[in-house]
Amino acid sequence: MAGGKGGKGMGKVGAKRHSRKSNKASIEGITKPAIRRLARRGGVKRISSFIYDDSRQVLKSFLENVVRDAVTYTEHARRKTVTAMDVVYALKRQGRTLYGFGG
């Protein structure tokens, strides 16, 4: 077998798309103290107990959008590694310019 990727008779294949895995329990990894710390950084003094589930959903939606755009930039550049610049450009595209990471 010759060097390179793929086995016998694989030939050239287009870019692989990553499957979108959805793990329901992973969103619970954002703990109440973590949400509380984020709120404190934003200047919140008291937090209602109903906020935690809503903030998890908002954070999940925000991160899905940013990651989707960053992966799109990565795939367009024919790379397999998402760089910090991909994330910076994804945030800039959504109107949330992030300074300090180049670009």
Curated annotation (Swiss-Prot):
Spans traversing the lipid bilayer: none
Pfam families per the UniProt record, alphabetical: CENP-T_C
Modification type N6-acetyllysine: residues: K5, K8, K12, K16
Compositional bias (Basic residues): 14-23
Key words, A-Z: Acetylation, Chromosome, DNA-binding, Nucleosome core, Nucleus
PTM field: The N-terminus is not acetylated.
Matches recorded under SMART domains: H4 (SM00417)
Chain residue ranges for the region called Disordered: 1-29
Biased composition (Gly residues): 1-12
The keyword Hydrolase belongs to this UniProt entry's keyword annotation: no
CDD domains: HFD_H4
A GO CC term assigned to this protein in UniProt: nucleus
Quaternary data: The nucleosome is a histone octamer containing two molecules each of H2A, H2B, H3 and H4 assembled in one H3-H4 heterotetramer and two H2A-H2B heterodimers. The octamer wraps approximately 147 bp of DNA.
Function, as annotated: Core component of nucleosome. Nucleosomes wrap and compact DNA into chromatin, limiting DNA accessibility to the cellular machineries which require DNA as a template. Histones thereby play a central role in transcription regulation, DNA repair, DNA replication and chromosomal stability. DNA accessibility is regulated via a complex set of post-translational modifications of histones, also called histone code, and nucleosome remodeling.
Protein name, per record: Histone H4
Organism name: Tetrahymena thermophila (strain SB210)
Record gene name: HHF1
